[in-house]
Design a protein with these regions (language model features):
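Glycine-rich phosphate/pyrophosphate-binding beta-alpha loops
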Residues: 3-5
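Glycine/small-residue-rich phosphate/adenosyl-binding loop
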Residues: 8, 14-93
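Glycine-rich, charged/polar anion/phosphate-binding loops
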Residues: 1, 54-59, 124-127, 147-149
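Short, electropositive alpha-helical surface patch
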Residues: 124-137
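Small-aliphatic-rich amphipathic alpha-helix that forms the alpha element of a beta-alpha
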Residues: 71-73, 77-126
Length: 173
């Protein structure tokens, strides 16, 4: 995956220990409940979260500890509040997380991208021994894709989310 200055400061913490996964799941569920009202407001405002998707989110919160593995994607260091540093920092780690998801898929493993655990980042760090100078970014629950029917996810048409030459402008004919 691309990384700023080719530093490869990413780190991947793979959780397979049942007790650690259970602790992580408890923090995740706590975050899930705290975010319930915000999620509902966002869904109402944007119309982007159908009921079936809400069920998927609840199922993940309820069953996170049952996943064969949880991968906590981290980056060494902590970005300060300057935009330039944050752009380079997250621009270095997020492609690595996505590349890992693609690699998992080629091996018959499914994963999903979530950052909900970050509401309780300190507690997560204490549970897993993550040093203070390491930034947690994404949690990837990983599971086997038995009998999975892979199909494109429902998405808006590209013309609805893509603009040409200025915000809101349709593609020139």
């Amino acid at each position: 995956a691309p990384t700023g200055l080719n530093l490869e400061a990413w780190r991947f913490l793979v959780l397979t220990d049942p007790a650690r996964k259970l602790g992580m799941a408890e923090l995740y569920r706590k975050s899930f409940e705290q975010m319930a009202e915000l999620r509902a407001d966002y869904a109402r405002q944007t119309g982007t979260q159908p009921p079936a998707l809400r069920k998927v989110h609840r199922d993940l919160a309820d069953r996170l500890h049952e996943m064969p593995a949880l991968i906590l994607v981290c980056m060494q260091g902590r970005p300060d509040n300057t935009l330039a540093r944050q752009v380079g920092f997250y621009g270095s780690i997020l492609p690595a997380a996505w590349s890992l998801m693609v690699a998992l898929r080629t091996r018959g493993l499914g994963s999903t991208w979530t950052s909900l655990h970050l509401i309780h980042e300190r507690e997560t760090a204490q549970l897993l021994g993550v040093p203070d100078d390491v930034t947690q970014t994404v949690l990837l629950p990983v599971g086997y894709m038995r009998d999975a029917v892979l199909a494109p996810a429902p998405r808006k048409a590209a013309r609805e989310v893509t603009y040409w030459n200025e915000w809101g402008a349709a593609r020139p004919d």
